[in-house]
Amino acid sequence: MKVAVMELRLYVPWVHSLKEKRMVVKSLLGKIRNRYAVSAAETEEQDIHQTIVIGVAAIVAHAA
């Protein structure tokens, strides 16, 4: 069994409010989850509107 964990730190200078950030984060999370079949969530910096931190995790039962 293999476990993969990744943290993505993104700077989004065009976002000027938490509402705008929420729209960007929801879109990114949906695309990541649908395309790669992994677990993903916003993990840090939730109150800072120009920084997005996304944690991604996957578990594989056997090596591909």
Q: Where are each of the predicted segments found?
A:
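N-terminal intrinsically disordered, cationic/polar leader segments
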Residues: 1-14, 23, 28-64
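A contiguous binding-surface segment within folded domains or other stable secondary-structure elements
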Residues: 20
